């Protein structure tokens, strides 16, 4: 759910004895850095009281794809949440978040902005996938995830355009 909430620009409402604050969901989780034991930006004594989803045009063209090892039905090798807002056949706004590739849901705003005003077609989604994963470095045991993520991004963007492709047993067009 974290990947989808990040893609949809959710806002986390936090309460503490000192008062309340709001944090964009994409900023709620942290990269390990010097404190790998802390995976979020909650401070001591704080409590999540609500999570809001802003009204956007993503309700029609949205998809979530989770790729996982057959032996493990819980943790994703790669997951992708995509929201597209179309107007006159062109992409007005795009949101793409990856899971399973970083310590937190991964978004690249420049890649989302690249899609604005473009046709929703495979070539544009492939270029976006390249932008999202530019500079990605894998290790011996997970290097395959980079190419897997690129393919998953393109597939999920195409799935978002066709909600019927998400029915159980449906075969995506890609």
Predicted regions and their residues:
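C-terminal structural segment of proteins
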Residues: 1-174
